[in-house]
Design a protein with these regions (language model features):
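An N-cap/entry alpha-helix motif that binds or orients negatively charged groups
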Residues: 2-70
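N-terminal active-site wall of soluble small-molecule enzyme domains
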Residues: 53-54, 59, 65-167, 173-178, ...
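Structural recognition of alpha->loop->beta junctions
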Residues: 76-88, 181-193, 236
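Glycine-rich phosphate-binding active-site loops on the catalytic face of alpha/beta enzymes
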Residues: 131-151, 189-196, 235-256
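Catalytic-face loop-and-helix region of soluble metabolic enzyme cores
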Residues: 186-242
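C-terminal helical cap(s) of enzyme catalytic domains, especially alpha/beta-barrels
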Residues: 206-210, 233, 248-266
């Protein structure tokens, strides 16, 4: 069986080399330092999850497993719909090849709203982190399955140097143990196996209770109904990253309100 994550990471190395060949660290650093001030991503989730659910609403046009998810994909209008529906933060896919995303999608989405924005991509090099801040990202994603401990710590440190938050993503107990050594309070449990793209909510149900209590637990992938959120909440999550189910909705704002309604008491 093809290891989807490994294939994507191989391509990311090519993309990083191309980026390094077309722009310098100094140029990106200057742009990052001149970018719009960082919006507190972790703070927004902590605030909203204290009184209900915290939602990272994702702008995702397509995926390797599902193909095209939303044809009428306008980042600005979708971002506004999410904000109107009560999302705490946004996540924007910027990978072109596998998710039909684009860095400019993040720029357009962030300019349209006041919400903090996560750059959802496969981070393997400090240059990508600086580029993310230059684009306006408030948070970056670190996928433990794609990184060794030293690189994960380095990328986290660079993100912190630029004032960004960091979402650390795990899929199994070994990755969770490694992630707990990092400093970020944001820890996501992905119900999707990125090597096979298979999804099971059993992953979150089993792993969420093991997260360090001083971290903000975020359940990711396979969340389609309030009952799905309730199951993850029972395991310890008050925050959720949801993309596909909301992207497929005719009325994105209404779907966002529905998924957030009647949160299970903590």
């Amino acid at each position: 069986m093809e290891n989807v994550l490994a294939t994507i990471i191989d391509e990311k190395h090519n993309q990083v080399r191309a980026l390094a060949g077309t722009t310098s660290f100094a140029t990106l650093d200057q742009a990052a330092k001149a970018a719009s001030p960082v919006r507190g991503f972790a703070a927004a989730l902590a605030r909203d999850s204290a009184k209900g659910y915290g939602l990272i609403a994702e702008l995702k046009k397509a995926s390797p497993s599902k193909g095209l998810i939303r044809a009428d994909f306008d980042p600005a209008s979708l971002a506004k719909a999410y904000e109107g529906g009560g999302a705490s933060c946004l996540s924007v896919l910027t990978d072109r090849k596998w998710f039909q995303g684009a860095p400019e999608f993040l720029v357009k989405a962030r300019e349209a709203v006041n919400l903090p924005v996560l750059r959802k991509d496969f981070m393997i090099d400090p240059l990508q982190i600086v580029e993310s801040r230059a684009l306006g990202a408030d948070c970056i994603l670190l996928i433990m399955a794609a990184l060794d401990d030293a690189l994960a710590a380095e990328l986290e440190s660079v993100a912190f140097d630029y004032g960004m938050d960091v979402l650390i993503e795990c899929h199994d107990s070994a990755e969770l143990t490694r992630a707990a050594k990092l400093r970020s309070p944001l820890m996501g449990i992905n119900n999707r196996n990125l090597k096979t793209m298979d999804i099971s909510l059993d992953v979150g149900a089993a792993m969420l209770p093991d997260l360090p209590k001083d971290r903000i637990a975020i359940a990711e992938s396979g969340l389609f109904t309030p009952a799905d959120l309730a199951r993850m909440a029972a395991a310890g999550a008050r925050c959720f990253l949801i993309g596909e189910s909301l992207m497929r909705a005719d009325n994105v704002a209404a779907a966002t309100k529905t998924i957030l309604a009647n949160p299970v008491a903590s």
